[in-house]
Amino acid sequence: MERKRIFAISGVKNSGKTTLICRLLEIFKDKGLKVAVLKHDGHDFVPDVPGTDTYCQLQSGAYGTAVFSAGKYMLVKQQPQISEKELAEFFPEADLILLEGFKYSTYPKIEIIRKGNSAESVCNPEKLMRSEEHTSELQSRSDLV
């Protein structure tokens, strides 16, 4: 089984992670790559809005719900913890998986530090993709550039 290509786009809140990811997704899509994004939310997100059937079902005690149509599905499962590696398994056909956030993960990452928003790095410098090794690897990847 081929190892998944996974890397993170990290930074503090409002640093531009989503903006960068959306721009990268456009480029990767134009290159014909299938890319999935896993986003970490440290605030226990609400997966649905009041008034929907699945929201009502979750509020009434369902430990999980799924909604699907001909072209997509959404799965919500009440579970104490799941790793990004386990979530990546939901996307076996992905050429690349981007992680949004995950500043403390062990995956290689790009950290966004933006003037007026973040003064210094919050990530492990050994995992940042700025070393000679990572730069050479990215430059040699004609399928990504």
Describe the predicted segments one by one.
Residues L96-S136:
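Phosphate/Mg2+-binding loops and adjacent switch elements
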Residues I9:
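Hydrophobic anchor at the beta1->P-loop junction of P-loop NTPases
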Residues V76-S105:
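Phosphate-binding/switch loop-helix module in NTP-utilizing enzymes
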Residues E133-V145:
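Single conserved hydrophobic/aromatic residue that forms the stacking wall/gate
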Residues K13:
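The conserved Walker
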Residues T19:
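Conserved Walker
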